[in-house]
């Protein structure tokens, strides 16, 4: 993801000094800057995915035989992670397709995911099931991922508010 993230900043920086760069990409500077912002958020999402993957072993090693509170918390966390994945996917699609409706829906889902994550965090603190520490670390990354998805949706909305740029004004 880090290598892919370098592409939008490189093009954006070149576009500041080279007008042909913008023409070659067939986008205007504001659009290019939005792509840069989205790429930056996706890079952060990828960082959280790596962290979640690294912590997954700790979560799995904390599970025991039989149904426990930890299993219930893990199921809630898995559902939250799926909802967060949908937020990111919807927000990214909204940014690429300039869809305000999708961006607003992604923001609504983002807010719900963050609220659900905070509620689960409180429940983990109160119940303190086995493996709660590892679960809370994964939960933190899942919530931050949802927030990054919300940031992508905000970029999509901001891009939709711009007036079209006429030829020669890029």
Q: Where on the chain are the PLM-derived regions?
A:
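Cytosolic, long alpha-helical scaffolding segments
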Residues: 1-170
């Amino acid at each position: 993801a880090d290598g892919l993230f370098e592409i939008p900043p490189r093009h954006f920086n070149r576009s500041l000094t080279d007008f042909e760069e913008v023409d070659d990409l067939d986008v205007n500077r504001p659009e290019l800057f939005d792509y840069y912002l989205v790429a930056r958020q996706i890079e952060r999402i990828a960082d959280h995915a790596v962290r979640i993957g690294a912590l997954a072993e700790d979560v799995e090693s904390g599970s025991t035989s039989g149904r426990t509170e930890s299993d219930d918390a893990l199921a809630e966390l898995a559902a939250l992670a799926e909802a967060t994945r949908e937020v990111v996917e919807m927000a990214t699609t909204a940014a690429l397709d300039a869809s305000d409706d999708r961006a607003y829906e992604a923001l609504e889902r983002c807010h719900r995911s963050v609220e659900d994550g905070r509620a689960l965090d409180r429940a983990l603190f109160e119940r303190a099931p086995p493996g709660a520490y590892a679960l809370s670390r994964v939960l933190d990354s899942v919530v931050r991922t949802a927030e990054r998805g919300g940031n992508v949706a905000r970029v999509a909305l901001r891009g939709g508010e711009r007036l079209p740029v006429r030829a020669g004004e890029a």
